[in-house]
UniProtKB/Swiss-Prot annotation:
Heterotrimer of A, B and C subunits. It comes from Caulobacter vibrioides (strain NA1000 / CB15N) (Caulobacter crescentus). The keyword Translocase does not apply. This is Glutamyl-tRNA(Gln) amidotransferase subunit A. InterPro entries: Amidase (IPR000120), Amidase_CS (IPR020556), Amidase_dom (IPR023631), AS_sf (IPR036928), GatA (IPR004412).
Length: 489
């Protein structure tokens, strides 16, 4: 067994027991990354920096100064600013941008002893559900349907993070989730991903898409690994005005905790048209597993669910059009010349932004314009409030909610890329938690008939990641999901 096959927890235990060093563990991952370049998961490899960080980690351990993630090699979604290391958001406009500061989330991981392997691919500015909008090309899912060589999407926007974890190219990865960008890729790649409560992780140093929806979180191999990473990533940050000043528990203590007596809500509105029978069956399996673990199953209603997707695709582009106004070619990033200032702006943005980003800027600018603001944007905000109220009402009946993560297994690269609506429908089960600011976790619970992974989602009350991890631990144990992508790369 290669060192790269280890879970994060097993690797940390092995390092603590002196079975191997961080340099050895890191080198094994660097070799795996080099062999897997065809997947395009990493858009920037930092092997020298990784070995340097690993050597320093081994030195700290020798002095008895090991942090909670000491010596563990991780991947970083290229939306997190990394001091002195190129950060692009996978756009042409930031192709050569090198930040002079470190995002809060990554600096906390390095503080706890983790090692950086490189920067991971994503949909441009985190806008997309298939990783096909990246300026650096799509990521290929390490999973393939049985008997097929067809390239599949790893999901998006955190496709690089999910593919790298699934292919054992890191022990865990940072990711972000604005409408499902952690959970849908996790479901497509047989990995675990959690979007915590809005404000649990600092957004400082994370390239902004939609500021009221964006939230950082980890993608990992197991529920326990995700809990380990989230514990390090969370915490109050005065540099982010939306960061919550509340204590962070050690989330790992809740994994494996009994769920006996918990009430699990099953929302009837999540039974959508054309949902594959396999996903419905998996949902029923999840219900049965939790019943066996001692949970009480409660039918609940989230009546405004059907408006969530349209509301999301008004609110998110509106915020994006505002956030992306800063890319003007003046202070940083790409600059295309022109005869006057307006022309420089136009040329820079026309050349620097990809089609999907332009589409969302146009939608956002339209819904914020005079005459349409009330009809679209204000209405979407009212719907958002109603969705949050639906959840508030549900919490009087249940402690957590169980749903599928995505309406399908991974689809082929290029299959939906010319149909934005079909692409947006990928988020049908995930956007509600972003609109309401709730924690949501996806974990792999089974394979479809083609041997592709399917995920279940657990949604929790605000700031109750503890219960989410307990329920996820129970589902993980019952599902016994150990399948890995067969290595073809």
């Amino acid at each position: 067994m290669s060192l790269t096959n280890l879970t994060l927890k097993a690797a940390i235990d092995g390092l603590a027991a002196r079975e191997f060093t961080s340099v050895e563990l890191t080198r094994a991952h660097i070799e795996a990354i080099e062999a897997a370049r065809g997947l395009n998961a990493y858009i920037l490899e930092t092997p020298d920096k990784a070995i340097d960080m690993a050597a320093k980690s081994d030195a700290r351990r020798a002095l008895g100064e090991a942090g909670p993630l000491e010596g563990a090699p991780l991947g970083v979604k290229d939306l997190f600013c990394t001091n002195g290391v190129r950060t692009t958001a996978c756009s042409k406009i930031l192709e050569n941008f090198v930040p002079t500061y470190e995002s809060t989330v990554t600096s906390q991981l390095w503080r706890d002893g983790a090692v950086m392997l490189g920067k991971l691919n994503l949909d441009q500015f985190a806008m997309g559900s298939s990783n096909e909008t990246s300026y650096f090309g799509p990521v290929t899912n390490p999973w393939r349907a049985q008997g097929s060589t067809k390239a599949l999407t790893p999901g998006g926007s955190s496709g690089g993070s999910a593919a790298a974890v699934a292919a054992d190219l890191c022990l865990g990865a940072t990711a972000t989730d604005t409408g499902g960008s952690i959970r849908q890729p996790a479901a497509f790649t047989g990995t675990v991903g959690i979007k915590p409560t809005y404000g649990r992780c600092s957004r400082w140093g994370v390239v902004a898409f939609a500021s009221s929806l964006d939230q950082a979180g980890p993608i990992a191999k197991t529920v326990e690994d995700a809990a380990l990473l989230l514990t390090s990533m969370s915490g109050h940050d005065p540099k982010d005005s939306t960061s919550l000043d509340i204590p962070v528990p050690d989330f790992t203590q809740f994994v494996g905790k009994s769920v006996k007596g918990l009430k699990i809500g099953i929302p009837k509105e999540y039974r959508v048209d054309n949902m594959p029978a396999e996903i419905e069956k998996l949902w029923q399996d999840g219900i049965a597993w939790l019943k066996e673990a001692g949970c009480e199953i409660v039918d609940i209603s989230l009546p405004h669910t059907k408006y969530a997707l349209p509301a999301y695709y008004i609110v998110a582009p509106a915020e994006a059009s505002s956030n992306l106004a800063r890319y003007d070619g003046m202070r940083y990033g790409l600059r295309e010349e022109g005869a006057n200032l307006t022309e420089i702006y136009e040329n820079t943005r026309a050349s620097g932004f990809g089609d999907e980003v332009k589409r969302r800027i146009l939608i956002g600018t339209y819904v914020l314009s005079a005459g349409y603001y009330d009809a679209y944007y204000l209405k979407a905000l009212k719907v958002r409030r109603r969705i949050a109220e639906d959840f508030d009402n549900a919490w009087t009946q249940c402690d957590a909610i169980l749903t599928p993560t995505a309406p399908s297994a991974a689809f082929g690269l290029g299959e939906n890329s010319n149909d934005p609506i079909a692409m947006y429908l990928n988020d049908v089960f995930t956007v509600t938690t972003n609109l309401a600011g709730l924690p949501g976790l996806s974990l792999p619970a089974g394979l479809d008939a083609n041997g592709l992974p399917l995920g279940l989602q657990i949604i929790g009350k605000p700031l109750d990641e503890a219960t989410v991890f307990s329920v996820a631990g129970a589902v993980e144990k019952a599902a016994g999901f150990t399948a890995k992508a067969e290595k073809w790369w």
